[in-house]
């Protein structure tokens, strides 16, 4: 969590997302989209894009341990109380926000990382002699890809819904690294 930037009327800017995290996020989005829509699963390009995704996930895991505070997993590990508080605020239409990841956002991050690890592992397994042509590996890969696609759609919908609810342009924050928070929004830890 960086220092607040100069104030604008009714808004306060906070530097949150570091360049690596933003580059990771958008690179992962592009590569996932490429493999889901544009590459043929039987082609070498699909395999190499999958390796690139696996490498990005490995880097993110390291960055989650050694990166700046807002990137560290320990800084946004959700508790049942924080999840309940966020859901209560949402149900009561209270404007609140988190400078870093919200508890529900953190759950989605962990879900996507775990799912992409599973996709990468099963994808790699399908390239080996030991698992080539084994039906359960292929089926698990397909199930995980479908789950990832559902999760990505839910993530995008939640980002736009939360942006509208809180008045914070979350896509802009992930592009610039700066969250512009309305002064009327309560910031939760």
Listing of model-derived features with the role each one plays in the protein:
Residues 1-189:
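Membrane-embedded alpha-helical bundles that constitute the cytochrome b-like, heme-associated redox core
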């Amino acid at each position: 969590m960086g220092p607040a930037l100069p104030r604008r009327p009714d808004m306060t800017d906070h530097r949150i997302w570091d360049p690596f995290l933003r580059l990771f996020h958008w690179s992962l989005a592009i590569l996932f989209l490429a493999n889901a829509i544009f590459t043929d699963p039987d082609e070498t390009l699909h395999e190499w894009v999958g390796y690139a995704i696996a490498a990005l996930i490995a880097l993110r895991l390291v960055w989650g341990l050694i990166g700046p505070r807002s990137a560290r997993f320990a800084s946004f590990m959700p508790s049942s109380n924080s999840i309940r508080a966020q859901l209560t605020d949402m149900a009561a239409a209270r404007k609140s926000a988190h400078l870093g990841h919200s508890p529900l956002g953190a759950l989605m991050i962990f879900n996507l990382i775990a799912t992409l690890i599973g996709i990468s592992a099963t994808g790699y397994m399908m390239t080996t002699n030991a698992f080539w042509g084994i039906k359960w590996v292929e089926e698990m890969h397909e199930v995980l890809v479908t789950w990832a696609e559902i999760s990505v759609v839910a993530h995008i919908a939640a980002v736009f819904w939360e942006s509208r609810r809180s008045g914070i342009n979350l896509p802009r924050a992930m592009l610039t690294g700066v969250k512009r928070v309305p002064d009327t929004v309560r910031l939760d830890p």
